[in-house]
Amino acid sequence: MIKVLDARFVTTAVEPKGYPTDHTAEVAFVGRSNVGKSSMINALTGRRKLVRVSNTPGRTRTLNFFDVDLERGGVRHQIRLADLPGYGFAKASKADKAQWEKMITTYLEKRHRLEAVVSIVDVEVGPTPDDLTTLDYLQAHNRRVLVVATKVDRLTKARLKPRLVELSKLMDLPLEVILPFSSTEKLGVDEVWGALLDTFGKSARV
């Protein structure tokens, strides 16, 4: 079992000079606007108000960093979470979209401390064209990607497995790399943390 010892806000940034300057291993959370990134981070950390949750799409317009202290099997880890602005917000102006895109791509391409990217997909909606483009982009830049199918509490158990199989085909990924998750029911919390620690846990030990 993985225990969250502490979780705290670190800083907000819009460009590299505002990024944290230490060597903590980072995980970025990406997904379309209003897919539930903030709710997922709150569920993972067990802190209901760590990240502000809004029903208004496009609310997150900066890179927001949070530090999480974890323990697994007596070994402590520290991971920094980076909450990125959502993509695909239809009501945003072209100028805002261009600014957000530059902010996100600069971080994803140049951040040396970025160990993995969690790509969040709505299990009912499925991968949007923006989701697929982002996945291709991350793979082209050799980023480790963990795909999380969120809001699975909206599906029955009988519908969930076939839907995950369908998602794996649509995204051209093995079924085992797509993790089901529910912020409402806290389903998949240990599995996501476990997958992240298995991927780069040694670099996150403290």
From Swiss-Prot:
GO terms for molecular function: GTP binding; metal ion binding. It comes from Myxococcus xanthus (strain DK1622). Belongs to the TRAFAC class TrmE-Era-EngA-EngB-Septin-like GTPase superfamily. EngB GTPase family. GO terms for biological process: division septum assembly. It holds the Pfam family MMR_HSR1. The keyword Magnesium applies. Signal peptide: none annotated. This is Probable GTP-binding protein EngB. Mg(2+) binds at residues 38, 60. Its cofactor is Mg(2+). Keywords: Cell cycle, Cell division, GTP-binding, Magnesium, Metal-binding, Nucleotide-binding, Septation. GTP binds at residues 31-38, 58-62, 83-86, 150-153, 181-183. Residues 23-202 form the EngB-type G domain. CDD domains: YihA_EngB (cd01876). One of its GO terms (cellular component) is cytosol. Necessary for normal cell division and for the maintenance of normal septation.
